[in-house]
Design a protein with these regions (language model features):
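Hydrophobic helix-and-loop "lid/oligomerization" segment in the mid-to-C-terminal part
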Residues: 1-70, 75-107
């Protein structure tokens, strides 16, 4: 995706160690999105074993609502979210496939 998409994640063990709650994570995905050259940002945090809450942000070239909807979530073109099952790598790979399709379509 040529650096047009950025992702970050935090696992449950790290959240527990630092006493982080989901509210503490508000805004991280938006900060990722403003990285120069990034058109789509993904932030995942683990809620239980093999389950992640996913936040997606876009500059508009990627319809993150469509991506979230594909995975059972919802939102708006520029801001959306969903819950996914699997490892963080599985989640990112599955999201990346959908983002890549949209980036190709937008060109």
């Amino acid at each position: 995706m040529d650096g047009r998409c950025i992702f970050s994640s935090i696992d449950l063990k790290t959240m527990e160690f630092y006493k982080v709650v989901p509210k503490d994570l508000d805004g991280i995905v938006s900060q990722l999105r403003i990285t120069k050259g990034v058109e789509c940002a993904i932030f995942l945090y683990q809620t239980k074993t093999l389950e992640y809450k996913v936040s997606l942000r876009s500059n508009g070239k990627v319809d993150v609502a469509a991506i979230a909807s594909y995975f059972g979530g919802g939102g708006h073109v520029r801001a959306a979210g969903c819950t996914m099952q699997g490892t963080v790598h599985d989640c990112v790979n599955n999201l990346s496939e959908q983002i890549e399709k949209q980036l190709i379509k937008a060109e």
